[in-house]
Structures are given as structure tokens and as C-alpha cells.
Amino acid sequence: LLTIFCLLTCCFSQAQKQDAAFETGEWFKFRIHYGFINASYATLEVKDDYLNGKSVYHVVGKGKTTGFASIFFKVDDNYESYFDKDTGKPYKFIRKIDEGGHTKDIEIDFNYEKEKALVNNKKHKTKTEYDIEKNVQDMVSAFYYLRNNYDVTDIKEGEEIMLNMFFDKENFRFKLKFLGRETMRTKFGKVPCLKFRPYVQAGRVFKESESLTLWVSDDENKIPIRIKAKLLVGSLKADLDAFKGLKHPFKIIVD
């Protein structure tokens, strides 16, 4: 579930660097529904940290099934990214998950001088180097990089966005299409949003390549407001449930 969430938050149109969209202390909580069942919660938090003597942002993402859903399919996911405060480049990515008994425990260290990623698979006790593309991002750092470096002021309906990403042991190009602007009803009030269609590989999880829709707040924060996904079995919806530490005012329309 957190895998889907992190992947979908990468969706802004390129422009010159703008005022920072986030700061240390930002925290999001998302309520995730599978059909009519309140299946899980996911959180994202921005912290200050040090890595190899350098001051970095450390983002921690967690996802866990709750209540009735955990009886049938237990999920306990942890994602972490350490990335540069100025450039947004990721230095280390951690993915430790347990999804219904399917487990992974992976750490990735990025070396930009060698243009390599060292993948430490702790579960299988292997270390392997892979070539990486320029301006590569991991699943978590991409969200924060795009929020700080991309602008959506003049984005046009139908415009497509591409991003270089590295995941587990693979480089891939992530594509999204802008579908337009829409005002969403939320627990906080009406929120003006940007609507996107991320393209994903159909198969084990998703029904088809256009199975996902994402709404992001149309303000300086660029907060993920809602995600909808058509799965091979059923459907999934994630809504922003709580937040704190926003750098900018949250644009809400009050009736």
C-alpha cells in the first residue's frame, strides 16, 4: 500500500527552482480504504539527520493494516530516504516490508561519482552494484524533489511528465499525464486540486496501465489529497486524514 502511495506522489511540471514547498517537521497521515473496508494508515514525516557527516533530510514513510483487514492480509511497510537539502539527490534508500508474508529488506546507497547504486539485499545477504541514470530519484525522495523544483502554474491539460527513478535494482522512466483541475470535498473542506493519471504496469497488482488517479492540492504545499486505484481484485482509495508542520497555508474553500 505504501509502495503505491510513494510512487504516485511524483507529479509536477518542470520549471525553474521555486520557494521550498516543505520543511523539517512536516507530517502527513493517510487513511486507506480497500473497497468499503478501512484497511490501513500510511504516514510520511520529514526529519533532520546526518549521513556520513553531512546534514540531510531524512523522510520516514510507514504503512500498516489495521483492524479487520489485518486478519486477512497483514501489511507492515517501512520506507526511508536520506537526501540532499539543496539538490534533493538521494544518498540512501531503505525499503523494509512485510505484505502478507511477502518480505523485502533492502538498502540502496547512491554513488554519483561512479554513477552506481549499491543494493544491499539483507534478506538474501547479497550486495550488487547497478548503473544509474542522471538525475535519478528513489520512490520517496522523488516526491520532495518535485515539490521543490517543479511548478504547475501553467501546466496544460494532456501534458505528460517523465522522471528517472531507481527501484530495487531497476532504472525506469515514470510517466504521468495532467488531466485538469478539480475541487475535491475533504474532511477539511473543499480543496482546489490538480488531477493526474500515473501510468503503471498492468499485471500482478493493477487492472490496467491507466488504473490510477491522483489529486494534489493546487497551492504551494502540493499535498497529495486523494489516490484512487483499480486493482485486479477490488479497488483502493487513500485520503489525507491529518497533517502538521506545513510550510505554507493550506488552501481550503469554506462554504
Regions found by a protein language model. Name each.
Residues Q16-Y112, V152-D255:
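Acidic, serine/threonine-rich low-complexity disordered tracts
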